[in-house]
Amino acid sequence: MKKVFFFLATAICAFSTLSEAKTKEKTVTVDDILPAGNIIVNKVSADTVYVETDLRDTDRFWFYWGMRVRGAEGKTLVFSFKEKSVGARGPVVTSDKGKTYRYSGGKYGKTFTYTFGPKEKEVWFYECHPYLPKDWAKFTKGLNKKLFTTGILCKTRTGNEIPMATFGNLSGNAKYKIVMTGRHHASESIANFAIEGIIENFCADSELGQWLRENVELSVVPFVDYDGVINGDQGKGRTPHDHNRDYTVFLYPETKAVSELYAEKIPVIILDMHCPWIAGKGSELVHCPMLDPKRIPDNAAEDLFSTIVEKNASGLPYKASNNIPFGVSWNTSTNYSSGLSCRKWAVLNLEGLRICRCFEIPFANAQGVEVNPESTREFGRSLAISLAEFLQTAE
């Protein structure tokens, strides 16, 4: 059941239903009733709201959250989290129910302070820029319908249909095939804007777009953990394991469907788009956790691709030296003890792969550059340039 918390100045009133508090004073409410909402309110003391992320079926602390605040016009409130859940530029804020977003300002930590304007009757706060199926629908609606096809990957265990789309050469006989996935971990939303940028260049009225449409078929699954995305789940660390550790036993129909898509397409390139830890050392830069070099189909090709991506990167900086080699930091076999990732399954089961890559897009800050929808789209556009250059170089 959704829970709404009401408080009046220093008084605390918590209700487990959506009934209104009957009072003559201005009532402030804090709840998770917004798209992909996720918050637990523990208490309110004076002008401080004590909150924490709703882990649900996640087996460890994770930092995603989204909350709605109403009735706080003219007030200054402090939001204090149980764990470090505020990103490098503070929360993402919208005062118009998701039409526009901005960073409120701040730094990585447990708290943020927000002064509500006199007309801000309802404000949504998120840990990061959200990206939901309605955003995907809006994006694809703006594209030339002749340049792509849409379909359904499969149905989730709850019966939701997972969208997919194909761009580029639609003949079925493209010289090169690429499969790109997003949201194996439900809360890693900023990476979807990079997916948009890649697609934009596949559809562009340009020499690059023309070459891609003649030579490359791009299959895209924007939301692997679709249910988790719409429900506002953490996604990472689900029990008994999350979607990107499900390529051993296939508990989730969507991961089985992705593996079948790989087997059907026999891609030369696989891209799996992710986001790292919320902030801090190693998490505020675009990077790629590399596979075991003993398993990589073509180490020289992977090195070449990194060099090309670094050269062409725009919007967000990327340096090949920031990649995490296998066996370093968290990128070890222990991290995959609960099951294979999509990439590990692919290199074990597919022939002809040249590139099998995960890109980690930071949530808010990339080597000092602000990570936002447009800077991330621009990075995606540069990735499309790099994909074309790599394939042309490899011919």
Question: Language-model features: where?
Answer:
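Bacterial Sec-dependent signal peptides at the C-terminal "C-region" and cleavage site
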Residues: 14-23
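Active-site/substrate-binding loop(s) of hydrolase catalytic cores
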Residues: 150-167, 172-349, 353-367
